[in-house]
Amino acid sequence: MRLAIRALLACAVLGLCLAEQTVRWCTVSNHEVSKCASFRDSMKSIVPAPPLVACVKRTSYLECIKAIADNEADAVTLDAGLVFEAGLSPYNLKPVVAEFYGSKTEPQTHYYAVAVVKKNSNFQLNQLQGKKSCHTGLGRSAGWNIPIGLLYWQLPEPRESLQKAVSNFFAGSCVPCADRTAVPNLCQLCVGKGTDKCACSNHEPYFGYSGAFKCLADGAGDVAFVKHSTVLENLPQEADRDEYQLLCRDNTRKSVDEYKDCYLASIPSHAVVARSVDGKEDLIWGLLNQAQEHFGTEKSKDFHLFSSPHGKDLLFKDSALGFLRIPPAMDTWLYLGYEYVTAIRNLREDIRPEVPKDECKKVKWCAIGHHEKVKCDEWSVNSGGNIECESAQSTEDCIAKIVKGEADAMSLDGGFIYIAGKCGLVPVLAENYETRSGSACVDTPEEGYHAVAVVKSSSDPDLTWNSLKGKKSCHTGVDRTAGWNIPMGLLYSEIKHCEFDKFFREGCAPGYRRNSTLCNLCIGSASGPGRECEPNNHERYYGYTGAFRCLVEKGDVAFVKHQTVEQNTDGRNPDDWAKDLKSENFKLLCPDGTRKSVTEFKSCYLARAPNHAVVSRKEKAACVCQELHNQQASYGKNGSHCPDKFCLFQSATKDLLFRDDTQCLANLQPTTTYKTYLGEKYLTAVANLRQCSTSRLLEACTFHRV
């Protein structure tokens, strides 16, 4: 009896273990069930141990999404539109593995939707009303969903019938698959014969990517909505392509070869989705990675992962070449991209915003942590609601919110401007620290500040830049300019490895791994334990003043800006730890191995650093710029209501929302990118340090790299 019970228990445990090691793949047809069974059996033949495959059948992709959310299945491959659906509540699924196309040496996980026009025409994207349009087909991504979603707020009222609204917007169109009886204007330009006119197939000559481009080339239409490769595929000669241009979202034009800087939206590839919590994403990746190694393109004669005798695009697209794992920090909205999500939201009545996203009524500022949120809320009240506040626990979380449209702007140090730029954000206004007079300050951004290494004058004279190994270090924060990117970039070029926690004996580098020696010196929040080494003001050693305090109380060297010592000594900081400090009690370490007075920073610094700058999404930049100029007129250094009501550039603690020594926010050229703002030298330094990067957001933002 006991043996029987033990056997039953063993079987139960084994069953649970196998269930935990099995990926339940959701299928939507009998043909998919057949391929899934072949997939399951083929995996067993080469990998008898887990991960295993089990097949679950549902009647539609939406039913598969529900099954995964309810833990009745684990995975299914979806197109971008369904990835969007799966990411919504109550499903909350996330993409975990992407199909890639193109080539294995240059894998492509997305394509660009573009608007193509003839070069000799003279209108912009905001002047399409009354023009003639060519579309790949009704409901298709590049040819309909993206352009119509982005143009939605320009469409004439009423918009309840989207097809009728579009037919009233354009003078004439060819939209294959449209109802030519109900909305004849959408089929007016089509050239199919008889019942093939406006057909949802190649029987309509203007159907699909090449068809929509032919509609433009023939002179039937004024604009064609296609994908970025369409012109190249149809016009391989550069001279012929030169007759066409792209319409950009900022109402300019570029050549058809400049599609990466002039597109309507990036449309990501099909992706495997899973639950956001307990979603088996490691197991799913392990399964698919092994599957592509054994059954990928030209790998096996018996089972083919990316084709099937049972039909087309079963389980995966036949055109896929393989899989790439999606970074953990990449949720549905980062995977799909802001432009794509905006377009799809506009087409969905149930989730459409009440006002167009580009309407400049309010700016939503992103605050990091509790102290910044308190200041932001005070700013919001004084602004009369023109400023709203969103908050997150780290700078990277705030950047992600801006990328996804959940916030609009924040001010960043150069290291985070680099990450924000890689995520598609642009610098809008620069903080100025030296220039004090009104218009001269606003119209002239400064060249930057100096990143320095500070030590105590009383420290061993042998403590120099060349003898930092084994010392205790204090940093403003990981990925910040003066406190991390510049000094660690210089160190990396000397030591040729990324193990900074072994180079320094211990330190405080907010944002580093919590169990590392580079978090040993951190002291966390005054309100209680548990916030040590957080990259926000809950960590009292965070930021310039925090890193300097770390030096005063615990460290051997602090990496800060050149103004930090001056701002916290000689009575300028009344806090208990700083009130008795003298500037002459500190020295700078020079890269040549000498030490100098803190006043000699111009001849003893590690590198020039770009000033902090406000960043936003490109389409929101003009609005952010306009509103912040209004705000600093009231609450800036010489604002009409500072200090009696509120001051933008003052903080209860240090450097909240902006640096406290900011004199004004200065205009930048509208064409400024993160690259031009940061400068070539700084970009090179940061790029060299990227192989040491711990930034999960940077990994996510550079996933769609082609």
Curated annotation (Swiss-Prot):
One of its GO terms (cellular component) is plasma membrane. GO terms for molecular function: ferric iron binding. Fe(3+) 2 binds at D413, Y449, Y544, H612. The modification Phosphoserine is found at S391, S693. SUPFAM superfamilies: Periplasmic binding protein-like II. Residues 23-349, 363-691 form the Transferrin-like domain. One of its GO terms (biological process) is antibacterial humoral response. The modification Dimethylated arginine is found at R40. Glycans are attached at N515. It holds the Pfam family Transferrin. Disulfide bonds join C26-C64, C36-C55, C134-C215, C174-C190, C177-C198, C187-C200, C248-C262, C360-C623, C366-C398, C376-C389, C423-C701, C441-C664, C474-C550, C498-C692, C508-C522, C519-C533, C590-C604, C642-C647. Hydrogencarbonate 2 binds at T476, R480, A482, G483. Residues 1-19 form the signal peptide. Monomer. Part of a complex composed of SLC40A1/ferroportin, TF/transferrin and HEPH/hephaestin that transfers iron from cells to transferrin. Transferrins are iron binding transport proteins which can bind two Fe(3+) ions in association with the binding of an anion, usually bicarbonate. It is responsible for the transport of iron from sites of absorption and heme degradation to those of storage and utilization. Serum transferrin may also have a further role in stimulating cell proliferation. This is Serotransferrin. It comes from Equus caballus.
